[in-house]
Amino acid sequence: MSAQNDLVMKSFNRWPVDVLNVGRSDSVAAQKYLARDGLSARAEMMPAIRRIVSANLRVGPEVSAPPPYLIKEVSGPRIPNRGRGLKVGFLGVFEPRGGGENPGDSTREMFAAARRLVPELRAKCDLLVVVAHTDLKNAARLAEENPQVDVIIASNPPNVLPPRQVGKTFIVCAAPANTQQGDLRLYLDKRGRFSYKFMSTDLDALVPADPEALAYTAAVLEELNRLR
């Protein structure tokens, strides 16, 4: 499993992502990657390690705690010129087993973590996104308790669910088992107000496979078979 996880982490270098949120089933693996012993060397091989976030992962002294959030500044011709780019803050949380705090799961209760950190992040960014490994019901509770949040991405729904608006917070769900590709588009007017459009596309046989991704997958499978 460790070799398989390494290959997945390396894929995030080939197809970069801005943020990696720790999910409930990822907590053990995340702590192995964040172990202080050899961290610099691992992060050089797998830079995605530096993009791991979690506001409620509890770690011991032998592990370097991930930041609770990251801020990415973006710019473009459709973003009103304010002398700087648009600062997007990503806060990562996950729902512990049983929905509350359980020391055996190395987690802190995610609702308390969000309430504590959302005001801090809100002061630093223009758009606040919570990436939450939880279901739609708890994502709605996060929105109710943290009305300063602009967008919540719920990444553990039981099935494909339509977007939901709670106050001014826009909630979208990631499709389970990578069955669909989500596309969330944000529109910023001249007054600095956001509106959203969400599309979800079936990843079926009608969607052509990327040749580079197919070649990478074949190489990964060959490597895993060699290690078995």
Per-range role (PLM):
Residues 1-228:
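Acidic, metal/ion-coordinating pockets
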